[in-house]
């Protein structure tokens, strides 16, 4: 049975714990600032942390990596272009297994060059700072690209089934999770636009 927990962090960040309760194996996605809360849950559920997966290299998503690796023999996972310290490099289409749970890596540059999303058993999508509830990630920071964001959103994420659940990296929306279908319908950044129009839209103040 899958154990899935969204943890509210400081600064509107979310961390996630994904575990196979039958095997006790677990992964943390985006350790963020409060590793202590993550450790508390892992110990209470008697879980073995095998992976710490970062959706991208910004410090508000990676700040807890060192504390978690000091407590658990877990591998830090990041996209191969990431500049953070990691043990396992991944790229588009790679599969990670946590017990019997499959995590599919979807490479989604745009917010950063190393941004990834994770599709959990084809049911849940952890989107980091690529897609939020009602918003998408900004592209005006170092390594950002509106052109890449367009292709990540429209040619990758919006091709997933409408009932796939969306779990973002920040609590920026009217609720803490959504679905691909709901985002297609209600997210103003995902309304049909040409690439040129999207780039102009993202440049608006």
PLM feature spans:
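Aromatic/hydrophobic pocket-lining residues that form the small-molecule binding cavity
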Residues: 31, 62, 149-153
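Divalent metal-coordination and catalytic microenvironments
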Residues: 18, 30, 56, 68, ...
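Conserved beta-strand hairpin/beta-sheet module of binuclear metal-dependent hydrolase folds
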Residues: 1-45, 117-128
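Short Gly/Pro-enriched turn/cap motifs at secondary-structure boundaries
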Residues: 6-8, 87, 107-109
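Well-ordered beta-strand scaffold positions
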Residues: 2, 81, 94, 101, ...
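Metallo-beta-lactamase
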Residues: 47, 102, 112-205
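Active-site HxH/HxHxD metal-binding segment of metal-dependent hydrolases
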Residues: 11-12, 23-26, 33-104, 185-189, ...
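Hydrophobic residues at beta-strand termini and immediately following loops
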Residues: 7, 90, 180
């Amino acid at each position: 049975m899958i154990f899935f927990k969204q943890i509210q962090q400081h600064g509107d960040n979310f961390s996630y714990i994904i575990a196979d309760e039958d095997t006790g194996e677990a992964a943390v996605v985006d350790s963020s600032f409060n590793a202590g809360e993550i450790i508390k849950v892992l110990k209470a559920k008697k879980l073995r942390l095998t992976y710490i997966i970062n959706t991208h290299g910004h410090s508000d998503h990676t700040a807890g990596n060192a504390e978690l690796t000091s407590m658990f023999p877990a591998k830090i996972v990041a996209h191969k272009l990431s500049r953070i310290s990691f043990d396992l490099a991944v790229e588009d289409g790679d599969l990670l297994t946590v017990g019997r749970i499959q995590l599919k890596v979807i490479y989604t540059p745009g917010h950063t060059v190393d941004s990834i999303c994770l599709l959990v058993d084809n049911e849940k999508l952890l989107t980091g700072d690529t897609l939020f509830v009602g918003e998408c990630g900004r592209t005006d920071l170092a390594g950002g690209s509106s052109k890449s964001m367009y292709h990540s959103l429209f040619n990758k994420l919006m091709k997933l089934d409408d009932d796939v659940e969306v779990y973002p990296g920040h609590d920026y929306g009217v609720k803490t999770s959504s679905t691909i279908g709901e985002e297609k319908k209600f997210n103003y950044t995902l309304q049909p636009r040409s690439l040129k129009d999207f780039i102009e839209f993202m440049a608006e103040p």
